[in-house]
Amino acid sequence: MLSSTFVRSKAGLVPVILAALILAACTGDAPQTPPPVNIQDEASANSDYYLQQLQQSSDDNKADWQLLAIRALLREAKVPQAAEQLSTLPANLSDTQRQEQQLLAAELLIAQKNTPAAADILAKLEATQLSANQKVRYYQAQIAANQDKATLPLIRAFIAQEPLLTDKAHQDNIDGTWQSLSQLTPQELNTMVINADENVLQGWLDLLRVYQDNKQDPKLLKAGIKDWQTRYPQNPAAKNLPTALTQISNFSQASTAKIALLLPLSGPAQVFADAIQQGFTAAQNGSAVTASVPVTPNVTESSPTDTAAVVSDDTPATLPAPVPPPVVTNAQVKIYDTNTQPLAALLAQAQQDGATLVVGPLLKPEVEQLSATPSTLNILALNQPEASNNSPNICYFALSPEDEARDAAHHLWEQQKRMPLLLVPRGALGERIAKAFADEWQKQGGQTVLQQNFGSTTELKQSINSGAGIRLTGTPVSVSNVAAAPASVTIAGLTIPAPPIDAPVVSTSSSGNIDAVYIIATPSELTLIKPMIDMATSSRSKPALFASSRSYQAGAGPDYRLEMEGIQFSDIPLMAGSNPALLQQASAKYANDYSLVRLYAMGIDAWALANHFSEMRQIPGFQVKGVTGDLTASSDCVITRKLPWLQYRQGMVVPLA
């Protein structure tokens, strides 16, 4: 028999249990309350959900839901709506809410392309007080605010973010760190001051030095990376190498035993093809004089047949580094005329003949066909298509005005010029050059580039006779969509598309902001253009003048050099005086036709590139110091040329220091 005490206790529990069940049933019928809000965590729902919760929540939770809604709106590229919500946040926020508000404000400014203001806000945030999720966003915002420029704060942001990431995001961070480090100049690297406890950063900098010291020798580089991994076992890159360096570990040298040279040896382009072939053959035989010698000739007056750049007696010749000794191998070269068969048939014939590498074709229509012509052969094309495809077996080497214009964009940017005007000949050539310059200009962070076209020499003479100068006005250059539009921004793995850009502002008078003019003209055209610019500008507002190699040709005597006073121009190292013996040899061969001399030089460098095809294709930053420029390859193996720049000064041509 149960005790009366137990019965009474059990009976007393019944009302309590019943009450609990009744309350539970009532709760089930009531509207569900959203879970507690954590603004420091992920915001994975869409903006409509958060805005709905904002409307339905109590005053205590409204600010939290609003902050989450702003983050979702940014993720959905609804930038104006995000800005509106941010501006209506209440003033009485908690410290946690205030931190999230500031982080969102920085992300909004980045989406609006106002990176300086975003950087100011980020500088006031204390990262140690942020959650792990917020830290990822904070460092991503710092990276975006630096506009991917190689700076110490940018590299530190990558390093700080690395432990917070996993999988693909982690590898992307490693690759981003390496890409930023790779953009540092030797001077920046040598003057960089870091803290004693920045062991990870020190390891990265040592890896960069290993790479820079050994990148010209794949075997040494591979050994250097392995040694670095032993010395820095805890560095994140020791466990997961940057993708670019992983490629080096898998480096394999391609065979160049048999080379097929594809050129138009008949037809209207034959004269150009002959010059390239002769340069290629001379380099193959070692008969091209390639030992570089500093040149400081004592010349005060030059004859029309001068073949070397003229430098003053008291000006040191700052010329390109010596080119490497000629690559002399036992390679067999067979030449094919591209005007005799279709490209696909020639490639098949070359492969049947045992070729392991193809150099050519030269003409752009045939180069455009390469991507649609399947071939397992390695191919060094001697021109560049309008849109290059990243084919693992193709590199593109062009000696074109567009290539020179891209180098000019870099040079003007390095000269601190920010508002360039392009003076180009009317027609397709001028349009291509202007587009190439503007594309490269905007990749560096430049804004709108203005373009003005000029007509024939007769038209220029008529203008100058009527007293008309050239005003510093122009129309915006139309560039490709990728280059013209601001880049989208990725924050914490979320891509925010760029907002629409405003219409460009065009300078309409000579008192505008134009600070540089890049001129594509022949010597006779430049003789007329320069005084016309002088007529329309005052000495105080005169911009710096730059020209292409098109303006530097044989026959330019002392009078011409005096008239061109102050103009800077670019040309290949051979023409700039890096190798006077070779220049004299080539100039005599082609009767001072500098156009053919440059193509002869292209043939010499094509031989060097063919023998370093694997390095150019597989090792980022690998460089060949050629007679047409310092040659490196982009990620899709488009060979870029860094050219020397010279200046007309007191009747002489001097290297630009």
UniProtKB/Swiss-Prot annotation:
Keywords: Cell outer membrane, Cell shape, Lipoprotein, Membrane, Palmitate, Peptidoglycan synthesis, Signal
Record carries keyword Signal: yes
A single cellular component GO annotation: periplasmic side of cell outer membrane
Subcellular location field: Cell outer membrane
Function description: Regulator of peptidoglycan synthesis that is essential for the function of penicillin-binding protein 1A (PBP1a).
Protein name listed in UniProt: Penicillin-binding protein activator LpoA
Lipid modification (S-diacylglycerol cysteine), residues: C26
MF terms in GO: enzyme regulator activity
Family: Belongs to the LpoA family.
First and last residue of the signal peptide: 1-25
Species: Yersinia pestis bv. Antiqua (strain Angola)
UniProt GO BP: peptidoglycan biosynthetic process; regulation of cell shape
Membrane topology summary: Lipid-anchor
Assembly description: Interacts with PBP1a.
Covalent lipidation (N-palmitoyl cysteine), chain numbering: C26
InterPro entries reported for this sequence: LpoA, Peripla_BP_I, TPR-like_helical_dom_sf
